UniProtKB/Swiss-Prot annotation:
Native source species: Neisseria meningitidis serogroup A / serotype 4A (strain DSM 15465 / Z2491)
Enzyme Commission number: 6.3.5.3
Protein localization: Cytoplasm
GO molecular function: ATP binding; metal ion binding; phosphoribosylformylglycinamidine synthase activity
The protein, known as: Phosphoribosylformylglycinamidine synthase
Annotated binding of ATP, by residue: G311, A312, A313, T314, G315, A316, G317, G318, E319, I320, R321, D322, A678, S886
Active site residues per record: C1162 (nucleophile), H1285, E1287
Signal peptide residues on this chain, from the entry's feature table: none
Catalytic activity: N(2)-formyl-N(1)-(5-phospho-beta-D-ribosyl)glycinamide + L-glutamine + ATP + H2O = 2-formamido-N(1)-(5-O-phospho-beta-D-ribosyl)acetamidine + L-glutamate + ADP + phosphate + H(+)
Length: 1320
């Protein structure tokens, strides 16, 4: 039993968080109470800690010992919120890590809780309601007193496995176990297992059954996609997967790996990649190598329904691991994400089309999913260090043909692209005797049965089993594991990894067998060698839990020493768990009980269970003609702008780091006003090239209700019209990922799925496209009992297409931002050819008007022709702006382009309206005069169709002088009849849409944009500090204050480092990182460009004495999440130096050396600020605390470089320019100085507004720092720290917006060149 030391911390909840809780309580009718909160820390150890250790703990945790813990009393109620009993929180893992690295011996674990005190009279029932408000039952417990916190450290006794008596009880015994264990085995699979175990003449263990269930779940084996289909009584010729494979067979060119690894690999290019060279003491060098592109997209729907934060976080983490475990190891680079949920029903903003049908108690509401889920996904990406650059958000919940269709089981999609050395793309064969290794985090009792649970309709499983199936994420340890993988593949042909897989559904029980089975091997494992963070787990829990951040891999025994040294340097846990055999048999040995929980042939586990046959019939949707003659067009426009699929997505974007890695060219935010309207994401392949990668998405689920195959073709079409904005070239260079969601088993849905796969396969083959990767989630149905009523919500068939392609020149990417140039016009290309079909449109959704025909990709040759023309115009720099038509139709395209460009529009749709009317009302158009036509309801309907149909198409802005040539290009492709000159830009802040002289819409663009951003604003208010959300909303229309600009006091094209570079002298710079830091590569690249000799220095190198700071002239402490920021950003990193006498002396000596320079950025800034006591001239320095918004802020912000002593900023003084910020704790705090800012403080960087005034206004000042402080320097200017990231934007191509005259380098290169000059 552990000794538990309680320590009292600081206030836990901010004033606005308290106010939100009180508002929620009031909404439940609870009586008024006074609420206070504080953090408490519980330190578990084998024996009582000595006084010196306790003193260090208090300093580390900012906490105090107490003689006795406080108790609740009459009228004062205690709610002690802790991690869920029986689990170990990610916070605890990281905090304990810090204590170990600070030399605090004897500590078993540190956990954190929050004591909430409520003063007031409450009944038992009211206390239960408050408990529900105060904790997340998925991840937390509420304890009645402090003594109960000892249960956090309770150790269970280990148990052995159990068996199911198949020999004695036959099939019935297995049927019973199937239900009790939540295995989701089919009747065929139960028969298969009974037959095989009877042949083996033994009973199956519970471990083997769970392992089989996971390995053979729909989630893992995709049985429906490999099934036979009988539709309307006829056997179909191909499986779903067969039709997907047809696309690759027809167009294999450009694809390196398809269908046989964790990700697909497509051809890239030979580029110079930048990373440390182990043979040169970890010196950063450029390496020219053939580099291919990884593409992967998958979903995490079931866990996100149950626990949105954890579900979305581990969804992102699992997809990242898939990329990293491709081939023999690779590097994830940039991500995408998306969410589809039912109606939000935002309090105070309930929309007229929203109805609340109810939901099962154990799943989260759509609003909670969208408040918590995106934060979970973003937090994982941020902490791991992968920019998220693309996404979508859709809501739908509607009664259609007698069924409620919607997304109570949400779609949470996570994907991305990565880079891989050509020589690492294929796994090698694992030889007999090879070691089988687990790399990454330890196992714990979470995520049991996730694969099987996600394969079931939501609501058909026991609620407790649903909770058991959700994992928890620890991105910081996944980052450490990725660093190990990076060090391995960076060894090139000396890479020790033979083969690698990520650990996902089914845990080790799925990953290890998959690893050896791929090589035709068997294996022997030692169960008790598996690293665990919880005591007392039984064999099933050890072998089958889905603890995240783990990989399995194989190496030769001779490479164990080098692999161990890499892991030790990165502080990444690993264990040799097994050995490969040549007998095809799987044995898991438990030495604790001297038995074998698993002992069976692999062909029983992964053999061919009976093939599934799916039988279904066509269920045709009811057809209702589309009518909209009585709808006010302006009102419709405002409704459409509020629909989440159309509305601004700021609340989903600014929470995600979009610049980490320094390879981002085009993120979601466009132009000098940073408007979230980009069509595609674009990254660069290296720091010395403009080659890159692009990715886009296409999804049209509401269309599937009307015509499922059409929805599939439209998804492909939308992905192509989105990615066409990038400089790709031949359409065959684009490769697609297809993610399929359906409610299989619901009558008619299997048939829709089959016909849609068939349609997409044929369309892709006609377009020269292939689908080398994808995933399915085919249990998209939620069922529950509501009193006497059985309810269900069935999702429409939902295909999400993600397109990936190599880019020839990222600088040619075109955005939707309208350019304020003279003599430009807007052209509209209508790929719907006047049909203007309205089925499934945003317009229909906001009026509950589920009628009309489905839009479709009727002619693939015309889409290809359109793409070819756009690509030629992109390559020739003929497009000023480009935006494809999608949700919200042409109206949404126009207003989004206007929002981005902050300019008015004068649009005349006369000819387009005529085409729409003639196409849909041919007889009327031939028999009536124009004025008679315009008096008809059909004409009003034509206006609605023209403005709001969502057929494929695009608007382009071009110079007037180029119009004739551009029309001729479309003529050559036989598309000229579908190109319309529709209008021009104006100086007025007004949108005018006309039919000749008749105004259809005439409205203020500020008002329209406020409506467009209202949904995002309201969710942001509920999630973050509402005062900050309101401040950002109030800036809409204040163009002068919110515009980005550059005012440099130097020549951006002059390289002041050039003379020093030409001299050949290269000062050595230590690029310093700690575990969890993720910004080292771009920091090293920036300094290398300025003539430094950069070296990768890990804190473990300094602690082990492999490296000494005295060998360097400069130190750069990098950004990221050292130890996951668990004790305050940068604090744990700093304490590991201050509490280590040798390191403290080494750093102090470096800081006092007059010949050195230091730069701390972001997490490095926070860390160095905590070392102020050993840095001369830092009196008055702030610490950095949580942002005022209490949210991670990723922005392109304006800063000013004031006059200061800073040597590295000396050459930039007086300049103002945009810079990337990405942090959660960047607010300069002067509490240690009584809240006073010293007149002598060396302020080196300040946030300013668009008028170059120091600002406190959020988000122009993204964190609330007083006096706009973004960076400070010490008295002699040798040590400068800042929260923004100049290293991520030293190249002009890295900036989301830049002045036109910035070509190769941005203004921020001057900082790095200035450092080189300062060292002489």
């Amino acid at each position: 039993m552990s000794v538990v030391l309680p320590l009292r911390g600081v206030t836990a909840l901010s004033d606005f968080r308290v106010e939100k809780l009180l508002q929620k309580a009031a909404a439940l009718g609870l009586p008024e109470v006074k609420l206070s909160s504080e953090f408490w820390y519980f330190v578990g150890s084998e024996k009582a800690l000595d006084a010196a250790t306790v003193e260090k703990l208090q300093a580390l945790l900012a906490a105090q010992s107490v003689e006795q813990t406080p108790k609740a009393r009459e009228g004062l109620h205690l709610f002690l919120v802790t991690p869920r009993l029986g689990t170990i929180s990610p916070w605890a893992s990281k905090a304990t890590n810090i204590a170990e690295n600070c030399g605090l011996a004897g500590i078993e674990r540190i956990e954190r809780g929050m004591a909430v005190w409520l003063e007031g009279a409450l009944t038992d029932e009211q206390q239960q309601q408050w408990a529900a408000l105060l904790h997340d039952r998925m991840t937390e417990s509420v304890l009645p007193d402090f003594q109960t916190a000892s249960k956090l450290f309770h150790h269970l006794e280990s148990e052995t496995f159990s068996t199911v008596d198949v020999l004695g009880g036959g099939k019935e015994a297995l049927v019973k176990a199937n239900t009790e264990m939540g295995l989701a085995l089919s009747a065929d699979e139960i028969d298969y297992l009974v037959e095989n175990y009877q042949a083996l003449q033994r009973n199956p263990s519970d471990v083997e059954l769970m392992m089989f269930a996971q390995a053979n779940s729909e989630h893992c084996r995709h049985k429906i996609f490999n099934a036979d289909f009988i539709l309307n009584g006829e056997k179909q010729p191909k499986s779903l997967f067969g039709m997907i494979r047809d696309t690759h067979n027809a167009h294999p060119e450009g694809t390196v790996v398809a269908y046989k690894d964790n990700s697909s690999v497509i051809e890239g290019a030979k580029v110079e990649r930048f990373y440390p060279n182990a043979a040169e003491n970890q010196g950063y060098r450029f390496h020219e190598e053939d580099t291919h592109i990884i593409m992967k997209v998958e979903t995490h729907n079931h866990p996100t329904a149950i626990a949105p934060f954890a579900g979305a976080a581990t969804g992102a983490g699992g997809e990242i691991r898939d990329e990293g475990a491709t081939g023999k190891g690779s590097r994830p680079k940039a991500g995408l994400t998306g969410f589809t949920v039912s109606n939000l029903n935002i309090p105070g903003l309930k929309q007229p089309w929203e109805q609340d049908y109810g939901k099962p108690e154990h799943i989260s509401s759509p609003l909670d999913i969208m408040i918590e889920g995106p934060i979970g996904g973003a937090a994982f990406n941020n902490e791991f260090g992968r920019p998220n650059l693309l996404g979508y958000f859709r809501t739908f919940e509607e009664k259609f043909d007698g069924q409620v269709r919607g997304y109570h089981k949400p779609i949470m999609i996570a994907g991305g692209l990565g880079s891989i050395q050509a020589q690492q793309t294929h796994k090698d064969e694992i030889p007999e005797g090879a070691l089988l290794i687990q790399l990454g985090g330890p196992g714990m009792l979470i995520g049991l049965g996730g694969g099987a649970a996600s394969s079931m309709d939501t609501g058909t499983n026991d609620a407790s089993l649903d909770f058991n199936s959700v994992q928890r994420g620890n991105p910081e340890i996944e980052r450490r594991a990725q660093e190990v993988i990076d060090r391995c593949w960076q060894l090139g042909d000396k890479n020790p990894i033979i083969s690698i897989h990520d650990v996902g559904a089914g845990g080790l029980s799925n990953a290890f067998p998959e690893l050896v089975n791929d090589a035709g091997r068997g294996a022997v494992f030692k169960l008790r060698e598996v690293p665990l963070e919880e005591h007392g787990l039984n064999p099933l829990q050890i072998w089958c839990n889905e603890s995240q951040e783990r990989y399995v891999l194989s190496i030769l025994e001779k490479d164990l020493d080098i692999f161990r040294s890499i892991c030790e340097r990165e502080r990444c846990p690993f264990a040799v768990v097994g050995t490969a055999t040549d007998d095809g048999h799987l044995k898991v040995r438990d030495d604790l009980f001297s038995n074998n929980p698993v002992d069976l042939p692999l062909n029983v586990l992964l053999g061919k269970p009976p093939k599934t046959t799916r039988t279904d019939k066509t269920v045709a949707p009811s057809k209702k003609p589309f009518h909209a003659g009585d709808i006010d067009i302006t009102e419709a426009a405002y409704r459409v702008l509020r629909l989440p699929a159309v509305a601004a997505k700021n609340f989903l974007i600014t929470i995600g780091d979009r610049s980490v890695g320094g390879m981002t060219h085009r993120d979601q935010m466009v132009g000098k006003y940073q408007t979230p309207v980009a069509d595609c994401a674009v990254t660069m392949m290296g720091f010395n090239t403009y080659r890159g990668e692009a990715m886009s998405m296409g999804e049209k689920p509401t269309v599937a209700l009307f015509d499922a195959p059409a929805s599939g073709r439209m998804c492909v079409g939308e992905a192509i019209t989105n990615i066409a904005a990038a400089n790709i070239g031949d359409i065959g260079n684009i490769k697609l990922s297809a993610n399929w969601m359906a409610a299989c088993g619901n009558e008619g849905e299997d048939e829709k799925l089959y016909r849609t796969v068939e349609a997409v396969s044929k369309a892709c083959q006609a377009l020269d496209l292939s689908i080398p990767v994808g995933k399915d989630s085919l249990s998209m149905k939620t069922v529950w009992q509501d009193g006497e009523e059985k309810k269900s919500v069935v999702s429409p068939l939902s295909l999400i297409i993600s397109a990936f392609a190599p880019v020839q020149d990222v600088r040619k990417t075109v955005t939707p931002e309208l350019k304020n140039v003279e003599d430009s016009v807007l052209l509209f290309v209508d790929l719907g050819f006047g049909k203007a079909r309205m089925g499934g449109s945003a317009f229909g959704q906001v009026y509950n008007n589920m009628s009309g025909d489905a839009p479709d990709l009727d002619d693939t040759s015309r889409l290809k022709a359109f793409y070819n023309v756009i690509q030629q115009l992109v390559a020739e720099d003929k497009l000023l702006a480009y935006h494809d038509r999608s949700d919200g139709g042409l109206f949404a395209v126009l207003v989004e382009m206007a929002f981005a460009g902050r300019c008015g529009l004068d649009i005349d749709l006369n000819l387009l309206l005529a085409q729409t009317f003639i196409t849909n009302h041919t007889a009327l158009s031939q028999s009536l005069r124009t004025e008679e036509v315009k008096a008809l309801a059909e004409w009003q309907e034509t206006i609605a169709r023209t403005l709001f149909n969502e057929e494929l198409g695009a608007v382009i802005q071009v110079r007037k002088q180029d119009v004739a040539d551009i029309i001729n290009l479309f003529y050559q492709q036989q598309l000229h009849h579908n190109v319309f000159e529709i209008g021009t830009l104006t100086d007025e802040n007004t949108l005018i849409i006309r039919d000749g002289q008749t105004h259809l819409i005439s409205d203020n663009l500020i008002k329209l944009q406020q409506t467009w951003q209202e949904t995002s604003h309201q969710i942001q208010r509920l999630r973050d500090n509402p005062a900050c959300a309101d401040s950002e909303f109030a800036l809409i229309g204040d163009n002068g204050r919110s515009a980005l600009f550059a005012n440099l006091k130097f020549d951006v094209n002059e390289d002041i480092a050039a003379p020093f570079i030409n001299s050949g002298a290269k000062p050595k710079i230590a690029i310093l990182r700690e575990q969890g830091v993720n910004g080292q590569i771009e920091m090293a690249a920036a300094f290398t460009r300025a003539g430094f000799d950069a070296y990768d220095v890990h804190m473990s190198d300094l602690m082990a004495g492999r490296v000494h700071l005295a060998d360097f002239k400069m130190l750069a402490a990098c950004g990221g999440f050292s130890y996951g920021d668990v004790l305050g950003a940068g604090k744990g990193w700093a304490k590991s130096i201050l509490f280590h006498p040798a390191l403290r002396d080494q750093f102090a000596a470096f800081f006092t050396d007059p010949n050195t320079l230091t730069l701390g950025v972001c997490n490095g800034c926070q860390m160095v600020s905590n070392l102020a006591e050993i840095i001369p001239g830092t009196a008055g320095w702030p610490k950095f605390k949580r942002n005022l918004s209490e949210q991670f802020e990723a922005r392109l912000s304006m800063v000013h470089v004031p006059k200061s002593a800073s040597l590295i900023l000396n050459e930039m003084q007086g300049s103002s320019l945009p810079v990337v910020v990405s942090h959660g704790e960047g607010r300069a705090d002067f509490a240690l100085h009584g809240g006073n800012i010293s007149a002598d403080l060396g302020i080196a960087l300040q946030y300013v507004d668009g008028q170059n005034q120091i600002t406190q206004t959020y988000p122009l000042n993204p964190n609330g720092s007083p006096q706009g402080i973004a960076g400070v320097t010490n008295a002699d200017g040798r040590v400068t720290i800042m929260m923004p990231h100049p290293e991520r934007v030293y190249r002009a191509a890295q900036m989301s917006w830049k002045p036109e005259d910035w070509t190769e380098l941005s203004g921020w290169y001057r900082l790095f060149a200035g450092a080189r000059k300062a060292l002489g």
